[in-house]
Amino acid sequence: MYRYSALELAKAVTLGELTATGVTQHFFHRIEEAEGQVGAFISLCKEQALEQAELIDKKRSRGEPLGKLAGVPVGIKDNIHVTGLKTTCASRVLENYQPPFDATVVERIKKEDGIILGKLNMDEFAMGSTTLYSAFHPTHNPWDLSRVPGGSSGGSAAAVSARFCPVALGSDTGGSIRQPAAFCGVVGFKPSYGAVSRYGLVAFASSLDQIGPLANTVEDVALMMDVFSGRDPKDATSREFFRDSFMSKLSTEVPKVIGVPRTFLEGLRDDIRENFFSSLAIFEGEGTHLVDVELDILSHAVSIYYILASAEAATNLARFDGVRYGYRSPQAHTISQLYDLSRGEGFGKEVMRRILLGNYVLSAERQNVYYKKATAVRAKIVKAFRTAFEKCEILAMPVCSSPAFEIGEILDPVTLYLQDIYTVAMNLAYLPAIAVPSGFSKEGLPLGLQIIGQQGQDQQVCQVGYSFQEHAQIKQLFSKRYAKSVVLGGQS
């Protein structure tokens, strides 16, 4: 049963072929079987999940219509609020914080009869690309337990990859959905800025953050977008981009023209380059024309991103001061000590590094030198993408410059930041982008193809991702490999 997609599970529960209670019990058994190896979750809510499943089964027995996610288990990244569960952001600062409300996306999932299984591990406050910066425990890649799952939504990607849940929610500020999706061999979608409400998401960088789904198929990503995309009066940045459903737009039609920034791809490892261009050859075989596009300005994207994201993070995290809520140092006896010790003891090293960088670039002496210049370059990146889209419908890039690396292999922060080279620009430019599994590296690890569209063209991006998935027979390719893994094998 754990190999079923969300669509298949919802259909089976709606038709009475499966019960929501049976589905929920099955996935908790799966979690109990392998979670000790993977470490995808921070907290589980088995009792509440089974109560919700029972209500769904009773609803069906009364002949009432069920929602789009009838009985579908969902994992939630632990920076998204769920009533009754702690929102820790994988930080000691919020270790005991329990929100009094649901995030809008969670509210909409519950309304469609989805079942929340628990909260998923992440890099602290979503700052990182390994999920090793969690204050609680690391998460391991289900394809190779000695390797990272990516981050910051590493728990979400690992949970979907290990089949602990068919779908999960993550957040993407600079690649935090797409990179772990590629590392763990699943589909990850970063919607356009404003396409999904951020109400109930603990902010990292408010002009960059976006909630999105991770799943084993593009169809399930489309299903989740149908459930929770759209305008929300509680989030002034949210917009109503879509008139029709995502599911109705899925087809195997290929785009007429795909743009490729070839000069930006120099230096790729041979097997990564070969996989990327062989993926594009599948589109060419179906009639797509590839054109070169000029996006050399993206070589500055990582620098610009870390200036702007850190500045916004420093501002957003200023509220965690030990006064109103969150961790309060027992050693503090004065107001000054309360601020200094609570934050110094509560935040991890990476979060403190970003806060320091953010406060530095926002200081009176440095704001013009760094922050304002970075804002100006961001505007140029937005313009460069607009120019590129005049030549093509869709852009394509790799998701990452390497497959998942070993835990402890990369320790230098700057080297880790450079892992984001192919993902941060889409956040800076507010664009939708999907990571779809595309094959395997020379080590046998998953790789991903990234498909990018114009802001508001999320449905086209998902449709092209679906087209690639079907023409490349990705589901069949990856299902053959699952059985060979200790974590991914077992009884169905």
UniProtKB/Swiss-Prot annotation:
Keywords: ATP-binding, Ligase, Nucleotide-binding, Protein biosynthesis
Gene Ontology biological process terms from the UniProt entry: translation
Record keyword Transferase present: no
Catalysed transformations (reactions): L-glutamyl-tRNA(Gln) + L-glutamine + ATP + H2O = L-glutaminyl-tRNA(Gln) + L-glutamate + ADP + phosphate + H(+)
Repeat recorded as keyword: no
SUPFAM superfamilies named in the record: Amidase signature (AS) enzymes (SSF75304)
Recorded GO MF terms: ATP binding; glutaminyl-tRNA synthase (glutamine-hydrolyzing) activity
Record InterPro entries: Amidase, Amidase_CS, Amidase_dom, AS_sf, GatA
EC number annotated for this UniProt entry: 6.3.5.7
Family in the record: Belongs to the amidase family. GatA subfamily.
Biological role: Allows the formation of correctly charged Gln-tRNA(Gln) through the transamidation of misacylated Glu-tRNA(Gln) in organisms which lack glutaminyl-tRNA synthetase. The reaction takes place in the presence of glutamine and ATP through an activated gamma-phospho-Glu-tRNA(Gln).
Subunit details: Heterotrimer of A, B and C subunits.
Name of protein: Glutamyl-tRNA(Gln) amidotransferase subunit A
Organism per entry: Chlamydia pneumoniae (Chlamydophila pneumoniae)
Gene: gatA
